Every structure is written in structure tokens, then in C-alpha cells.
From Swiss-Prot:
Changing A9P: Decrease in both antitumor activity and content of alpha-helix conformation. This is Polybia-mastoparan-I. Antimicrobial and chemotactic peptide for polymorphonucleated leukocytes (PMNL). Potent antimicrobial peptide against Gram-positive bacteria B.subtilis CCT 2576 (MIC=4 ug/ml), and S.aureus ATCC 6538 (MIC=15 ug/ml) and Gram-negative bacteria E.coli ATCC 25922 (MIC=8 ug/ml) and P.aeruginosa ATCC 15422 (MIC=8 ug/ml). Has low cytotoxicity to normal (non-cancer) cells. Exhibits preferential interaction with anionic lipid vesicles over zwitterionic ones, which is further impaired by the presence of cholesterol. GO terms for cellular component: extracellular region; membrane; other organism cell membrane. Changing D8P: Decrease in both antitumor activity and content of alpha-helix conformation. Transmembrane segments: none annotated. Expressed by the venom gland. The modification Leucine amide is found at L14. It is found in: Secreted; Target cell membrane.
């Protein structure tokens, strides 16, 4: 799992 990608996605959602 790409945590960096997940963090980026969460940032976009926020």
C-alpha cells in the first residue's frame, strides 16, 4: 500500500 499516495488522496478529499 502506498501511504504517500493515500495521504495525498486524503489531502485532496480534505
Amino acid at each position: 500500500i502506498d501511504w504517500k499516495k493515500l495521504l495525498d488522496a486524503a489531502k485532496q478529499i480534505l
